[in-house]
Design a protein with these regions (language model features):
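Short, intrinsically disordered, charge-balanced linker/junction segments flanking boundaries
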Residues: 107-109
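N-terminal glycine/serine-rich phosphate-binding loop of ATP-dependent small-molecule kinases
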Residues: 1-96
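Carbohydrate-associated surface elements
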Residues: 103
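Glycine- and other small-residue-rich loops at beta-strand/loop junctions that grip anionic moieties
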Residues: 99
Length: 109
């Protein structure tokens, strides 16, 4: 088995996943795009459910790849464009989209 690491980047326009050896050699990479919403002037949002769906789809695709048969993931690093609270209900469902770093609705505060 080859030890490897997985990086997950939840960016402004897409999530990017990369599996790489400890020496930095890339084994696999996948990118999934999701939309940015502009519901009002100055409002810029994304849907956390879409982040999650993209991450899950990319991980599933990568783990099914033949290159992963001899890979042992030793660690996962997660990075994002800017973190914020995600309101959920008691069943864990996301209640609303999240403002992202480009949102200016609180600029006057």
């Amino acid at each position: 088995m080859m030890d490897a690491l997985m990086g997950i980047d939840v960016g402004t326009s897409s999530c990017k996943l990369t599996v790489f050896r400890k020496d930095g050699t890339v084994i696999l990479t996948d990118t999934r795009k999701y939309p940015v919403y502009y519901p009002q002037d100055g409002w810029v949002e994304q849907d956390p459910e879409e982040w999650w769906e993209c991450i899950c789809a990319a991980v599933s695709k990568m783990m099914a790849d033949d290159k992963m048969k001899e890979v042992n993931i030793k660690g996962i690093g997660i990075d994002g464009q800017g973190w914020s609270m995600i309101p959920i209900d008691k069943e864990g469902r996301v209640l609303c989209r999240n403002p992202i770093w480009m949102d200016t609705r609180a600029a006057d505060l």
